[in-house]
């Protein structure tokens, strides 16, 4: 039975359309809203006939419609300037709601109350200086002066108590607001990204890069609220309060002093306009660096095997270099802005001194008023100076919030159309689904390259339907459209006569289940993986699906049975497929789609699983994409798709009548037919099988736990008395174990810990040592310290100058010395501004050199680690990229901001105290006496910050990892309809992070409040002591004013140090983790060995036993394995899933160390690893194609000319596919090679292996994703190879190709011999290769 689909289009190769003209039939167009036929007519005209169908969009329009967020293309930043320029400060409040107004209002009230203490302090300080001035001019007595100073000291003590309350409140509330914004941002981004269509992600260069960028922006946004917004709001409130007091005492003097402040505002605004583009470029290049690192670490075995560590390192280094250049540009502008602003902030006292002197001379103000105005304006200057370092972080927060808003509000027309059209809430499943002239082109590919062309087919419900066709023919595209991952470019799909786009998403999700060819196993227990979102399933249902999918065969051998934690790397491919199948069978939806569901299973398991599916799914719709024709019964419906066309729809028995298909796809049947002629098979065997064959008319659920399958009797069973052996007994006999049983006690929402609880962030001493070790950095760092020393010295010098200026007002003639000291104000202001610029920029250069050195060193060391290191859960690729990319800004801050600030503050304090000692040692001694208390509390504060910050970073990594896994595996997760499960896990992780953030906010706010209030108490003590020292004539008034000014500035710098502690703690943690990675010792395997010799290819295993490093105790993946493979021999390694086959490969490629393995008689441990790997090639079952283009991926690790490349493509039959691509070999390779089918990826990996000209070729299920025709062609290539070939396979055709077969089971070599020798009922191989069947 044929379905006509315009078979007169043989020139359409791989669905590449050469458009002539098109003229649709009017009646057809009028009857259906979207019904086109693509023929040899103009595609241009066809595209002009756009249908009003809401779900159809021109291919060329989708990219702009879907991706209006910035992207990196060929190292060029697209739309960066434009995007950065349109951001506004309203974006900053995007994540706050109307209901947050009371909280925000309360936070601002507390901020104002906390800020009011500073002008009150200034007011009391003015009162103290006024009392000193009146006493110096004999206006009051000594007792009156002491009384006034003591009273004001008491006021300051009260202010200190109030500061403890207000500081705690304001600090806690700002961090609380930050936590709210971060929680909402993560929740919203998860919802938005998980709701995006597959079309959106097909146009996204990297899912991992996007997730990293989102995480980075959320961190910047959170940070900008918790610290910069807090600093800015508080200092603005302080400035406003001080201005009010200043205006209250002398409005004219205040206006004169502040006359140059508008210039500061203009300078800051002008320079900020250039900061945006620098930040955006830094963000985009960091995103690219994170993608490169994640991809490399995820495919680390491929990278190491091809000796491409240096190349991947250079790719990462180039991206980091771009990021660093943007960072330096940002730092230069920020330093220039800060230097100019600092000059104007200090120079205001130039005109203030002249005018104040004039007012004092004319008796319009008194000394106390002048001191109050100067003190208030100085507080304003100091507050604005503290705002300057916060501006860069605030700007990053602004543009990060704009990115989040842009991402969350980006219009996805595909999803919008689906939501608007989704009206159908129920389906009866009475008819079936229908494709009506459906054509489709992926939006990420060339518009003329259609994957499906004019597909029209009807499939009734309740059928088992097989979809077959060559690799890349459009089978998976067919399924993607049915799952509504994409919408048809032209045509319509109907489900039960309802347009697919009108069916509610939840209804569709509860109707269809997808099992992918490469199943996704999540970090949870086996039971949780299977029951996912089916918590109400009974235990009997769970056990039944485990039995049907044969999960119990390996799960019941574990101590914890189904509750054994697992991760993807711990399971063989077949075991992963069985878990995925059990998960799908438990859901038991009306429609089940299986994409090569048994490609990684051995023949016995494959047949048993397929038979179980047939029985369990009887009466329900099951679509199976397969290349294995032996799995299709004669009466089952088959759809044949080739080059985007539906070629045939018929029963299997009709299909095999065609010569092409008979020759191409029936090799497995031929193998089985040959078994009938084998003299070792008893003639009554088939009748015996039929006798116990299951009756499909009976309910499959009635199968008992003791169901059996045929022909698996013990090897010792007598040939004359064949018996049927219980499958449970076989499980008990075999005690099947996984090849890599390295299960971790973990869950999806687990928290990552790079440090254990006993480890701490590295000390500042260790950090300084790491700085000094970088020779290139030393001079920059020393120069930065020198300029910081100058800047730090400028503050006490300025304090000294101000004290001299204040002393002028206590003279009989205040005008004496005004010209000199006002000029000194300008000199000090200019020096301070210049030193600020040079110090900040030089330290930024130092930070760039330091961070780049250690993170590049860390990456270089990572590429030398053994596989056992990467198997550890804390070395997950996302964690490593977050440490080495996302958190690098915190490490930069260690030098560019924090060391600079701390050193400046330290310099100021030392100079201030030394100067105070020189001027009057007694008061300085009081300050020194209380400094241990300040140091102790600061130390405790720092410890609290480090511990709470590490806890918060761990939960953030955990939350981000869930987002990362969800987005990377989004199609699979949607296929299982378990997105709600991951949303719930994400919510649970957010709850944990929320609790962690609240704990951090409480304890750090308490520590900050205590430290801040101590400064008030110390100042009160200094004032109290000053009155006593003056009364005892230890000081003159002039000396006391100078010492108090210096001491006050010293306390101000101590306050600056305390304010920087949060950033210091975060930076110490980030720095510690980078330094820890950079200090790792290289692995032993990659550089091991020294022998080089003319490799022939003979392999020997001599009693090899091996257990994976993290496996259960006493569990051996290989147990006393002895085997020999001759040079140029083709040997097939066969066995059930988990028997140890892949472990042999791991040891041969020196992934793990092992003794007693020999190549050409030389011990493997003594052979030079890099030299050996160049002589070996491997084609994995799930190959990784690395490189930016197809050509780069083929030449990955080798240097060959184009002729060799084309020859390799010819041998793997990929030439035609490549030639039909718009850019040929220069076609970009998308993330996860998603622009190729699984079979095409395997063939490209095979071509890459051939280009290495190997002496030893290892094929690990290299044809599992190939159709039978492609597989047969590759087998011819393999047959003609002259090197040693090691074939791991479950395919009988590949086994027949081998000169010899080695059969493994449970890590033991059972037997070896040729195919014909092993095909008798006495052998383990016969049981393995023979069709297993369920019986009662």
Swiss-Prot record:
UniProt organism field: Schizosaccharomyces pombe (strain 972 / ATCC 24843)
UniProt domain ABC transporter: residue ranges: 433-668, 1099-1331
Protein name, per record: Mating factor M secretion protein mam1
Ranges where the ABC transmembrane type-1 domain occurs: 104-396, 781-1066
SMART domains: AAA
GO terms of biological process kind: conjugation with cellular fusion; peptide pheromone export by transmembrane transport; response to pheromone; transmembrane transport
Residue ranges, annotated region (Disordered): 1-29
Membrane topology (UniProt): Multi-pass membrane protein
Spans traversing the lipid bilayer: 92-112, 154-174, 251-271, 779-799, 898-918
A Pfam short name: ABC_tran
Entry superkingdom: Eukaryota
Residue positions binding ATP 2: 1135-1142
Lineage: Eukaryota, Fungi, Dikarya, Ascomycota, Taphrinomycotina
Localization (cell): Membrane
Entry-listed glycosylation sites: 437, 454, 536, 664, 697, 1011, 1063, 1120, 1235, 1280
PROSITE patterns found in the cross-reference section: ABC_TM1F (PS50929), ABC_TRANSPORTER_1 (PS00211), ABC_TRANSPORTER_2 (PS50893)
Record topology, Cytoplasmic segments: 1-91, 175-250, 800-897
One GO CC annotation: membrane
An example molecular function term from Gene Ontology annotations: ATPase-coupled transmembrane transporter activity
Extracellular side stretches: 113-153, 272-778, 919-1336
